[in-house]
Amino acid sequence: MDISDFVKKAKEYNVLGIKISKDNELAAEWYSEPECRRNIYSATKSFTSCAVGFAVQEGLIDLNEKLTEAFSGDLPECIDENLKEATVRDLLTMCLGQEKGSLMGEQRPLYEEDNWVKMSLVIPFKYKPGTHFVYNNVGPYLAGILVQRRSGCDLVSYLTPRLFAKLGIKRPTWETDPLGNSFGAGGLFLTLSELHKFGLFYLNKGKWNGKQILSENWIEESTKAADVGYYGYLFWRGEYNSFRADGKYSQISMILPKKNAVVSFVSECRRGDELLKTVYELVCAKL
């Protein structure tokens, strides 16, 4: 596959590398510098979604469980009526009900409170859950906390035998909160090739090397657009009926089921929307 047109533009957007697979075969790749593990920022959220999927599959988590039950020991004295209605599913859709985003990157170093679970649940729930899309790190963070509590281990330890080891991803680094819990909303460090394998895993609907590891039903449910917003369970939806893990500065693995393809790239781009449009036009359109 000829991606020379994209490579010319890629330099304008500080793209560090791109990998493209079609029909499970490598179609093209390009790097502006050697591969290394990088912070994939909010693309981490899609790995948290995957962890929730395994936990649901193992009977550890029920998406319909109320947050007041799941976090009964962390609730404020006065429980918001909208919080009473929120479920585990609402943690995954960016429709939790809070008015604005919290636990965001620039905020986290400034918090005096170390218990981010209790801090997250005391934030007012202005909207009825499921009615307003507000990009917010609280949902994926709490989802990750719940997986850790129910499984008894951090997210790296939980995903290693279930996902990472099978994909050949050796013990990655993952940011933690002040109490040592994996931060489910960001801070996972991977190479481009490792991120690309994750995309291939989802393209193949939870299969790896011919073996079904994660339920195909979960893959389909978690990557379709929800009723509110262009978003699944911690996956963005996009053109060509695609879905993607998407992190700050354009750390992306895009899955295109109808084209049987995966396009992954890492960058230091401050113009993410423009870069994404360029990928659609100069890469996806040629697949």
Placement of each model-derived feature along the sequence:
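Active-site Gly/Thr loop motif
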Residues: 218-264
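Active-site SXXK
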Residues: 24, 39-64, 91, 143-147, ...
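Catalytic-site signature segments of enzymes, centered on catalytic residues
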Residues: 27-34, 104-186
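Structured C-terminal helix/loop/strand segments within mature extracytoplasmic catalytic/sensor domains
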Residues: 22, 247-287
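A short, well-structured edge-of-sheet supersecondary motif
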Residues: 4-34, 63, 253-254, 260-264
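Solvent-exposed loop and edge beta-strand segments that line ligand/cofactor-binding
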Residues: 36, 40, 79-82, 128-135, ...
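Active-site helix/loop module of the DD-peptidase/beta-lactamase fold
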Residues: 60-98, 122, 151-190
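Active-site-proximal alpha-helical segments within enzyme catalytic domains
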Residues: 142-146, 184-207, 251-267
